[in-house]
Amino acid sequence: MKKATILVSLVFLVSVVYSQQGSVVSAQVDPGYFITHTKEELIRKLVDRPCGIIPDDPIRVMLEKLGTYLETFIPDTEYSDDVYAKAANEQALRSVMQGGYGIGAVLIDKSGKIIAADYNSQIQKHRSDLHAEMTLLTNFERSLKAKKFMNIYVYKQGLTVFSSAEPCPMCLVRISITGADTKYCTPGPEDGMVTRINYLPSYWKDLALKQKVELGDCSPIMQKIAHLLFYSYLLDDRGPK
């Protein structure tokens, strides 16, 4: 009887753990989702979002519907970084609506307040260096308020750069030089540097790892929208030819 009771208890415990793991796994996004190569793939994914987009919508209408959804989206409190994901995605959309690439970034202080926000401006300003994170940090460092957060060019502890997309090599190194932590909303399996951090020269790798460098705690819907904004250039083939 005692053995039977123990066995039943073990079965119950395993079933509970399995169900909990299943719920966690179901909340994650299939890694394959974060690879998009064609306009057709992108449109299918846009239509699948709860934004009311249909395949025949003009590009401008698709983006406006996405913008309306983002504007009314309430960050999920189960995900500690969802409010920053929304803010970064809103910046990314601003760039897209201007004809630029869909990446945005925000700077967060140690209290969790967003103190700066910006977006990719490469196309708009004809500047190869103006990735979202680069634009964010440069404009912040030029601002009057930056003085209280900086020691010459290194930021005081507790600041975080949150990007809508996984930073590239240039941006990851720039963030590392400032001493800020790095977080991002959507992974970049084909171009992100965080997941390839071991390939950095040893000095830059060690510098980057002195701070937190990680995927943000974001809802699946924010991750997917960040990905779709990143690849929105496929809609009209914008950028250098």
PLM regions and their residue ranges:
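Short, glycine-anchored, charge-dense loop/turn motifs used at functional sites
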Residues: 109-115
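Short beta-strand scaffold segments in enzyme catalytic cores
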Residues: 103-109
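A short, polar/charged loop-to-alpha-helix boundary motif
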Residues: 121-135
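Positively charged n-region of N-terminal signal peptides that target proteins for export
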Residues: 1-4
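Zinc-dependent deaminase
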Residues: 20-94, 167, 173-241
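Mobile, glycine- and charge-enriched loop segments
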Residues: 136-165
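Short beta->alpha transition motifs characteristic of CBS
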Residues: 115-123, 211-216
